[in-house]
């Protein structure tokens, strides 16, 4: 189903698919569910809700689809690179800022055995906050990496996905939007091969593809491959997609996503 109202901020915004909004919400809830069970895991491959991390890949696919659908046909008329980046900044960065500020506050008041935020200097927390506000990754082992577990954004761990979201948007605006559908298909295939090779070789060291949240080892490479494949696949889908009406589509898709993400490791 489509919502025919447009955003007040952008008068030329296209109608959006409410179904995709709903599925994004379902995937977000599944990520929370995944991380709750992660706290009870005995190993990287025993996380109860084992493939919940793939919801991030679903987000990347959705982002690619929405960006392609919303902007592909505007570049020859009203859209330029500056305008595109302005729109995406307005769409994405409020979440970065809000998450960083809330993360800093909760870090300063927490006092659990695992991470006692009261034992970290305020100056380092403020430095971590500043880096997070500008989406600059913290260097593992540095003072600004206040949790000490190698995260790019220790005050708000999920910001790593927005870091790659920005990379996807930059690649789209500067290069990928100019690709023909055939060239885009080739890119998707090559990215899929790269991601599959990463998985088969277990470069993550975890036995799965839950990577991208750290600068350590091959983590950054894995995150980039996840982004490149999923975001490009979403862009390709936006070009070849033909809308059809399916009764109960939201529930069918929601159940399918939940089942796929809960499949145990073999």
Where are these regions (language model features)?
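Membrane-water interface at transmembrane helix exits
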Residues: 37, 68-72, 103-107, 176, ...
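Alpha-helical transmembrane segments and their helix-entry boundary regions
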Residues: 20, 83-84, 92, 161, ...
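Short, Lys/Arg-rich, polar N-terminal cytosolic tail immediately upstream
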Residues: 1-19
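Aromatic-enriched alpha-helical transmembrane segments of multi-pass intramembrane proteins
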Residues: 124-266
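Functionally critical transmembrane alpha-helices in membrane proteins and complexes, commonly lining
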Residues: 15-74, 90-100
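Membrane-interface helix termini and inter-helical loops of multi-pass transporters
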Residues: 42-47, 112-118, 206-216
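Alpha-helical transmembrane segments of integral membrane proteins, especially early/N-terminal helices
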Residues: 13-26, 122-123, 187-191
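Transmembrane alpha-helical segments and their boundary/interface "anchor" motifs
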Residues: 53-56, 73-113, 118-135, 168-169, ...
